[in-house]
From Swiss-Prot:
GO annotation, biological process: N-acetylglucosamine metabolic process; peptidoglycan turnover
Pathway(s) the chain acts in: Cell wall biogenesis; peptidoglycan recycling
Enzyme Commission code: 2.7.1.59
InterPro entries: ATPase_NBD, N-acetyl-D-glucosamine_kinase, ROK, ROK_cs
Residues reported in the UniProt entry to bind Zn(2+): H157, C177, C179, C184
Annotated TM spans: none
Superkingdom as given in the UniProt entry: Bacteria
Gene for this chain: nagK
Pfam families cross-referenced by the UniProt entry: ROK (PF00480)
Name listed for the protein in its UniProt record: N-acetyl-D-glucosamine kinase
GO MF annotations, alphabetized: ATP binding; N-acetylglucosamine kinase activity; zinc ion binding
UniProt family annotation: Belongs to the ROK (NagC/XylR) family. NagK subfamily.
Role, per record: Catalyzes the phosphorylation of N-acetyl-D-glucosamine (GlcNAc) derived from cell-wall degradation, yielding GlcNAc-6-P.
Amino acid sequence: MYYGFDMGGTKIELGVFDANLQRIWHKRVPTPREDYSLLLQTLHDLTREADEFCGSKGSVGIGIPGLPNADDGTVFTANVPAAMGQSLQGDLSGLIGREVRIDNDANCFALSEAWDPEFRRYPTVLGLILGTGVGGGLIVNGNIVSGRNHITGEFGHFRLPVDALDILGADIPRVSCGCGHNGCIENYISGRGFEWMYKHFNQQSLPATEIIANYNLGESKAVAHVERFMDVLAVCLGNLLTMLDPHLVVIGGGLSNFEHIYQELPKRLPQHLLRVARLPRIEKARYGDAGGVRGAAFLHLSK
């Protein structure tokens, strides 16, 4: 059995998956945000409850909204203050008597999609999240590529490419980013960036849902905005494809529900790729909110 924890700032969800990778049990509880001992006890109790349900001990994986430190295994996660700087992996492993694997929740998203029955045949899968920010993960032969510092999927912190500046104008503000730098692409091609860009060019604040609704009605400002956004998205994704050359791209996050993306990217991407390059397959994520739990459980499928 494979146990996967999706540990967020407000809730912890545990999913149990059988040998066929089908979810057979799950439970959700509030996250103890401030008390590390209580956080460990909560994870312990959920694990024991799953053991009782299964009649055996399953493997344990945890997806966190943050990064494990590559050198000492401590956790960096602003959303769960109780776990910040703690050796969560080692502490929980000692408490429940088995190996625990921990990874970034965006990597878990990508791993979940890569282990989809249809998608497993693709050797390299790029999971791309276009949500409040931009991130994701790279999966090669069913395994997460973490890199030296566990930051391989931090795509949102690439700077705006020169071709994007040609589209947006050289005087486009280099928006300050939470990482401490300016001009990171997540401030332009995320859901938040989608709204910011509309406000910048139209001097009007609208939520993404309303902009998209106006676009579907053919409203001129919304149409011009979406065209501009798609061009910038294609430039940024083109750089990623040239660097990583995946067979499959799976898009998640709030903007993944904008179906126009899947029609427009194949038209716009080729001009930003090498002439010999063939487009990867581009698909919408299949597992939605369940992807974090699935991917965390499947950390034990990786080598």
